[in-house]
């Protein structure tokens, strides 16, 4: 076993409020501004069509995820699973990102690898600087929603954050028809 810790930050109460950058129409802006590829935009459009056909409802930020808004996420259920598997290196931080990821929180903690999976614009705006300041040099940040078909705000927030940084999101090499996977390796700070 490793002596490394696995940290998990979550509100365990569902999504926070939606920002205008989470509006699904932002995908059109991303495409028009050549931020996302034609293939990405077409995949998004197909995803929307399928979701609306299956649900019979118009897609929106609050209905686009198959997990809905994650309001049914259970801290106690997750803790039970952690205990069942006797995983003693996991630290769960329960609460609103504005409080749990404040600049003065966990200042002595360092991350070597981070899975950034917080879906919405505002969550990314809070989490990105908090996590980036704690990633060790040569550490990795995996951007789960950078190639999202549901959450445009994640891409917008990441691009805003990395705009003035030397390190930029990069796509893993892929074969045709593979899903895009994006990461940032911290080399500069």
Per-region residue spans from a language model:
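S-adenosylmethionine/decaboxylated-SAM
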Residues: 1-189
